[in-house]
């Protein structure tokens, strides 16, 4: 059931979940149905990772990576995302960037640097935000919080299909191993570990189509 956001604030629906749970696709579909904006928070972490990789920074250099996040030069233009003036939409979906992003997402300095940048996306008429801690940390007063789950094998198959469709080589066994490692990092990190907010609706999409999952979210919103 939807709840009221803070007085004067635009309504927010948060969709959190592990890697390749479908949250990005669902967030975009729900936002389109409602005529709202969408925030892909994972893109900000991937952009930070890409910027750090371009500078040759190891993922273990927390202060340097946090400084990159603080000064991140990004621009979103519809489906396109630009890093330092260059279209980075393809690069940020590479597995190397995703694994780096998962590591640096545990750093308090990186998370704090990106926090207000994420909150700035909250504008009328409303926002659908997807990520890992949107409901628990970034938008704790969200009108509706969804935590999307799916079994890891299904998620690995989805990611493999997505990468191949984008012309990126992918190996299912490697993806499955990386995904299990990423899940462990995300759930065990000290800062904002991956977990549903106390008032979130947990939605298992393992046996659902995209359309069925979108409708389930909209049903929660309209309830």
From Swiss-Prot:
Swiss-Prot/TrEMBL catalytic activity: CMP + ATP = CDP + ADP; dCMP + ATP = dCDP + ADP
Keyword Amino-acid biosynthesis applies: no
Offer a single GO CC term for the protein.
Answer: cytosol
Q: Identify the InterPro entries for this entry.
A: Cytidylate_kin, Cytidylate_kinase_dom, P-loop_NTPase
Q: What domain of life does the native source organism fall in?
A: Bacteria
- According to the UniProt record, what class of enzyme is this? transferase
Q: Which family does it belong to?
A: Belongs to the cytidylate kinase family. Type 1 subfamily.
- Protein name per its UniProtKB record: Cytidylate kinase
Per the UniProt record, the source organism is Bordetella pertussis (strain Tohama I / ATCC BAA-589 / NCTC 13251)
